[in-house]
Curated annotation (Swiss-Prot):
One Pfam short name: Rnf-Nqr
The keyword Metal-binding appears for this protein: no
Family according to the record: Belongs to the NqrDE/RnfAE family.
One BP term from GO: electron transport chain
Record's subunit section: The complex is composed of six subunits: RsxA, RsxB, RsxC, RsxD, RsxE and RsxG.
Protein name per the record: Ion-translocating oxidoreductase complex subunit A
Gene source species: Salmonella typhimurium (strain LT2 / SGSC1412 / ATCC 700720)
PANTHER family for this protein: INTEGRAL MEMBRANE PROTEIN OF SOXR-REDUCING COMPLEX (PTHR30335), ION-TRANSLOCATING OXIDOREDUCTASE COMPLEX SUBUNIT A (PTHR30335:SF0)
InterPro entries the UniProt entry points to: Ion_transpt_RnfA/RsxA (IPR011293), NqrDE/RnfAE (IPR003667), NqrDE/RnfAE_oxidrdctase (IPR050133)
Membrane-spanning ranges: 5-25, 47-67, 72-92, 102-122, 134-154, 171-191
Amino acid sequence: MTDYLLLFVGTVLVNNFVLVKFLGLCPFMGVSKKLETAMGMGLATTFVMTLASICAWLIDTWILIPLDLIYLRTLAFILVIAVVVQFTEMVVRKTSPALYRLLGIFLPLITTNCAVLGVALLNINLGHHFLQSALYGFSAAVGFSLVMVLFAAIRERLAVADVPAPFRGNAIALITAGLMSLAFMGFSGLVKL
C-alpha cells in the first residue's frame, strides 16, 4: 500500500509530467486561459490517460510481447490512444454538449498530447504491473490536471492584473509556468522513485 501511495505522490508532485518532464505543454498553454475549460480538459485527459495506460499495458503484455512484436509498441500505443480519445469524445458529446463545445478542437488533440503517449511508454519502460500502470496513468493525469487548473486560475488573475506591456500575454504565462516549475521543484526531496 505504501508503494502505491509513494507512486501516486511521486507522480503527481515530484515527477509532474508538465513541470518536470515537460510533456503535454501544448494543451497546458493552449487550454489554460479559462478555469472552466482547463477543468474540463483536465477531466477528459484524466479519463484518457488512465484508460490508455491500462489498454496499452494489456496490449503490450497480451499481444506485443507474446508475439515478439515489441518493435510495434509505439504505433500500437498511438492507435490505442486514438481509439480511447474517440470514445472519450463520444462520451463528452453525449453527456455534456456545453463542455464539448467549450473544448472544441482541443478534445481531438488529446490524441497528439505527448504526455498520454509518454505515460504509456514509461509504464512499460519502468516495468510496472497492471495496478501500477493504472495508478501511474491516473497519477500522471491528476498531476497534469492539477497544474493546468492552477495555471488557469493564475492566468485569469493575470488577465485583470496591471502587467507591463512587454510581458502581457504569452510572455507572462511562460514566466508564470517557470515559477510554478520552481515551486514544484520544492517537492523533489519528498519521494525518491
